[in-house]
Regions:
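Charge-rich, well-structured scaffold segments of protease-associated domains
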Residues: 2-3, 7, 18, 65-222, ...
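Active/ligand-binding-proximal structured segments within catalytic/core domains
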Residues: 11, 18-70, 253-265, 273-275
Length: 430
């Protein structure tokens, strides 16, 4: 993939990619700060800021002005917060990409953060927090994160806890932004039917004068916790279960083998978990696995939502599939199919401008360089059955597993981590 890349004198990294066949253009601004950079007294700040940038900026002082300008050309603007990044994006017809860039740059650089808006949006965020806490399927993922990263921001809810969010102020939000929205943490990517030289100049004019700020180191990831099981008693028709293991950081040499292993285990309707737990045993409607990779840590998690009376059976069946990956090499036919699945997902992602802009910005922020599709395909094709069995045996051992469950009290009280040797923590429904 050919693209243009420049680092501005202040440290902002810029990537632009002309896609002559596209009718759209996409802006992606990745800022290398998320909930991981927070403390117990300001947890939820990154997410709060993500909300606040839509409330008004220096040149567009109301939320309606921002939305009307973007939607007036048929476009969209969005933002999201993760553990290590906050993302601001826009998707528009290609002829309007400079407008989209101007709006997104305005949101990142000059949000008003007015006291009245903070008070109003606080109520919205509190309701968002309550919504997720009411949903057992969301709560169980929070519990497994807390087990995997004990007493650490990587294990906390991105939106924060209600008592802390109630105390956040406009002054605190501004201070956090001034500290962490440093040019060296900002990546701007534009893809679509654009003029690359024009796009590069436009980014330079909007981000080139940001003042340089000293870097702030993130708190290192914690060691794995001793508590292996965490459950929440909550009325409902289902038990929601997560089984998790610590994995590897973003740049670890085993990352791609674990990616392939995860696809075999729990991605898609042809994955082993889906075929065994849903198609064969009819235990669940939703069963899957997923991975997350951070700068210095990572994890792999299995999720299933099941009838409470069959929760133990579902856990046993899922662990049996993991044990099979440790004990038996993956057959050649399955390995070829899953390699093609992973490669195909990469190729399809790059068919549209949104995928390309996020691809460029994400790799630049997290990897410090852009891997070509051809390089990734070569890496994937080089992973063999022995590699998969090795990483399964190293990372997915039963004594390294953690278990979280949310559901009826009698059900979750019976569930423990696979080796059954660690503390069981019960919570009251809230």
């Amino acid at each position: 993939m050919r693209y243009e890349r420049v680092t501005l004198p202040n440290g902002v990294r810029v990537l632009v990619k002309d896609m002559p066949e596209a009718r759209s253009a996409s802006i992606a601004v990745y800022v290398g700060v998320g909930s991981r950079s927070e403390t117990k007294v300001n947890a939820g700040t990154s997410h709060f800021l993500e909300h606040m940038v839509f409330k008004g900026t220096a040149t567009r002082p109301s939320a309606s002005e921002i939305s009307q300008q973007i939607e007036g050309v048929g476009g969209t603007a969005n933002a999201s917060t993760d553990k290590e990044a906050t993302v601001f994006s826009s998707f528009v017809p290609a002829r309007h990409y400079l407008l989209a860039l101007d709006i997104v740059a305005d949101m990142v650089r000059a949000p008003l953060l007015r006291d009245a808006d903070v008070e109003s949006e606080r109520n919205v965020i509190i309701e968002e927090i309550r919504m997720y806490r009411d949903q057992a399927q969301d709560r169980v993922h929070t519990l497994i994160d807390e087990l995997l990263y004990p007493n650490h921001p990587l294990g906390w809810e991105i939106a924060g806890r209600e008592p802390v969010v109630l105390g956040l102020t406009a002054t605190g939000l501004r201070g956090f932004m001034d500290t962490y929205y440093a040019p060296s943490r900002i990546v701007v990517a534009i893809a679509g039917r654009i003029d690359e030289a024009e796009a590069m100049a436009a980014v330079r004019s909007r981000f080139g004068d940001l003042p340089v700020r000293p870097p702030v180191a993130a708190r290192p990831a914690p060691k794995p916790g001793r508590t292996r099981t965490r459950t929440l008693a909550k009325r409902g028709e289902q038990a929601h279960v997560c089984i998790g293991w610590r994995g590897v950081p973003q740049l670890h040499p085993d990352k791609f083998a674990i990616d392939i292993l995860n696809a075999i285990l729990g991605e898609g309707m042809s994955s082993r978990l889906f075929l065994e737990l849903r198609e064969k045993r009819a235990l669940t409607y939703d069963v899957h696995s997923y991975i997350s990779n951070y700068a210095d840590a990572g994890h792999i998690v299995i999720y299933a939502g099941v009838a409470p009376t069959r929760a133990r059976e579902a856990v046993a069946a899922a662990l049996a599939e993991v044990a099979r990956l440790r004990a038996e090499p993956v057959a050649d036919a399955e390995l070829v199919r899953v390699r093609d699945f992973v490669k195909g997902r990469i190729e399809l992602r790059l068919e549209h401008s949104r995928g390309v802009s996020s691809w460029l910005a994400g790799q630049e922020l997290f990897l410090d360089r852009i891997r070509s599709v051809e390089e990734l395909i070569a890496i994937i094709d080089g992973i063999g059955a022995a590699d998969l069995q090795r990483v399964a045996q190293r990372y997915l051992r039963p004594e390294l597993a953690y278990l979280a469950a949310v559901g009826p009290r009698a059900t979750v009280a019976e569930l423990t981590a696979p080796d059954g040797a660690e503390e069981l923590t019960m919570e009251k429904a809230s």
